[in-house]
Amino acid sequence: RRRRSQGSEVNLTGQGQPCHSCGERCPGFLAHKWRKICQHCQCPWEEHGHTASNQDLERSLCRLVSGSQRDSLCDSSSDSSVEKYAWVPSGLNPVQVHHFFKCFPEKKIPYINSPGEKYRLKQLLHQLPPHDSEARYCCSLQGEEEEELLLLFSQKRRLENLGRGCVRPISGTMSGTVCQQCGHQINVGEVAVFASRAGLGFCWHPQCFTCAQCLELLCDLIYFYQDGKVYCGRHHAELKRPRCLACDEVIFSLECTQAEGFHWHTRHFCCFECECPLGGQRYIMKDQRPFCCSCYERLYAQYCDSCGECIGIDEGQLTYGGQHWHASESCFCCGRCGECLLGRPFLPRHGQIYCSRSCSMLHTKSERPFSPSQMDLSFQKETKDVGTSTNHELEGDSITNCTLAGSRTSLSVIDQTPTQAAPARSLHSSLRGAPKGFSRECPNRRSLPDLSSHTRTPTRVTFQLPSHSEIKESISFSRPSFTSSSSSDEEEGYFLGEPIPLPPFLRSPGYTAPPTHVPTSTRKQKKKKDKSCFLS
């Protein structure tokens, strides 16, 4: 009688082999004692390299499936014109081989030392699991009885269902042949795949010869025929017997555990992290892997964006836009007034949620300060994350409309040089100082700068009308006569003889507009100048 193998004696994937999926993140394959995964990256063993040569691996897998080394299953063409391929269908000339592989995506063509060759080897290990055919690759068989069941299972599948597709061009006598997969006609002269177990005249396009379950190309044209469909070895075995989700082996024991549409050996139904038994216990499935409650909370629990505490698996959770909250009145509430938002519409803004637009505007009305050199940014750049701001860029001598905290204020900025926009420091000296109603707590929004801390000599501003060629829009005046002023005869705070009032958003409580009269001496001087001033 054969001695039962422990599974660790034979392994097609050698220790330390690199992972094709993780790359350098995985230090190398380290076999789990009974799972078919790497302990480092937790990827399946077929994702890693192998110690055998390509030809030895191919022949080994074919032997596991067929029980012999028949040429029809293992030998490939030795023509020198097709040596660039790791495998080719037998019986084809180089031109037909080229037409056959032209039907496949580039990344799946098995050129030597290419991604297509790695894909082929990976699919051989996945579609034809060696532990489905030989006990020496298994680690979960209990006793010689289960080993005998595996042997009978493998022999019956090989005799009744196993086959390998044959590729040949469609001849003139077979015109009108239809693909069994897509239903489209295969033209005369095109290559097609024939499966003898399906019957005479049944054929497929090369790209349509896929497993009926996983829809992957049948590697090396090896198929298992069942009830009018072709399957890969893995999924055909699952039609006959359940497969353990943990160890990836076919279950031959009398009892097994079934949950979430999957099966396990009874002893293998355990936490993926700590491997504690889960029979009769609460568990959570994540990515088709069961976890106990404590491991799941430690690895995957989310934290509430309101209180910062961990959200337990027994607590209600609300999720929106990558944020998480406890489903409680104290956590899922308006960030301004604290009103509960459970079952109500809400407005997300700046990582907070609000019950209304007014609350969101009040909470974002005050923003962090910025230096005077950044003042031009507040008028020229659009703040995209603030829904209440609409800013427009300065264009020459045009009027710039800036909306701050929901109130629209128009500022007229005219530069002394007609071809450039007004510099930020050429604002009137009456604009110094931040208004009292603004705070600077929110870091995501700009507000007016605090210029009171910057001690500097008040800048005297001289306003000058643009020349006739520079005026983009018609200008109307309410006074019948006017005069151009200069820094020598215009009093500060006045422009063209009229007082300059503060903008509404800069007016402090109790603000009174400046007097509308000007000194008598100044008025007399202007009247004298009016006589000699004219418009061209």
Curated annotation (Swiss-Prot):
Residues 438-448 have a biased composition (Basic and acidic residues). Residues 177-241, 242-302, 305-366 form the LIM zinc-binding domain. GO terms for molecular function: zinc ion binding. Keywords: Cell membrane, Cilium biogenesis/degradation, Cytoplasm, Developmental protein, LIM domain, Membrane, Metal-binding, Mitochondrion, Repeat, Zinc. CDD domains: LIM1_Prickle, LIM2_Prickle, LIM3_Prickle. Residues 418-536 are annotated as: Disordered. Residues 66-175 form the PET domain. Residues 474-487 have a biased composition (Low complexity). GO terms for biological process: cell projection organization. It is found in: Cytoplasm; Cell membrane; Mitochondrion. It is a peripheral membrane protein. Disulfide bonds: none annotated. Its main location: cytoplasm. Residues 450-467 have a biased composition (Polar residues). One of its GO terms (cellular component) is mitochondrion. Interacts with vangl2 via its C-terminus. The vangl2-dependent membrane recruitment of prickle3 is a prerequisite for its polarization. Interacts with wtip. Wtip is involved in the recruitment of prickle3 to the basal body. PANTHER family: LIM DOMAIN-CONTAINING PROTEIN, PRICKLE PLANAR CELL POLARITY PROTEIN 3. Involved in the planar cell polarity (PCP) pathway that is essential for the polarization of epithelial cells during morphogenetic processes, including gastrulation and neurulation. PCP is maintained by two molecular modules, the global and the core modules. Proteins of the core module include the proteins Frizzled (Fz), Disheveled (Dsh), Van Gogh (Vang), Prickle (Pk), Flamingo (Fmi, Celsr) and Diego (Dgo). The core module proteins develop subcellular asymmetry, accumulating in two groups on opposite sides of epithelial cells. Belongs to the prickle / espinas / testin family. This is Prickle planar cell polarity protein 3-B. It comes from Xenopus laevis.
